[in-house]
A protein has these predicted regions:
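Histidine/cysteine-enriched polar flanking segments
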Residues: 1-119
Length: 119
């Protein structure tokens, strides 16, 4: 699915007719809920969380604000790679890596939790 999306993007242009630059980020994980983590989430009418269930983690869930990129730290094996890729792609920004597993456990990450609230 990711490769199909990449092929579609490669064939598109922005409103000024420029090719879209694609920056590939590594995939963390696979990451899963531990039994302790799954049991520690308050029950709600949303999705249940089960031990061993895979977490939906992505380095693309970052936030750009005031000359900084706030990047979720997800996996010690791939965090540094993601930081380097984004720093090279966005040299005018300071990359700030933030431990964010607790946010990930509830679903989503930095970009998701900073979205606007409609009036």
């Amino acid at each position: 699915l990711s490769r199909q999306a990449e092929q579609v993007l490669k064939s598109q242009h922005d409103a000024k007719g420029r090719e879209i630059e694609i920056v590939r980020l590594p995939l963390p994980g696979p990451l899963h809920y531990s039994e302790r983590e799954a049991n520690g989430i308050d029950a709600s009418s949303g999705m249940s969380r089960q031990a061993g269930e895979r977490l939906s983690a992505s380095y693309a869930n970052f936030l750009i604000v005031n000359g900084h990129v706030f990047l979720p730290m997800l996996d010690e094996d791939t965090d540094a790679i993601a930081i380097d890729i984004l720093q090279n792609a966005m040299p005018e920004y300071q990359i700030i890596a933030i431990p964010s597993r607790e946010v990930l456990l509830g679903g989503g990450n930095i970009h998701c939790i900073t979205q606007q609230i409609p009036a």
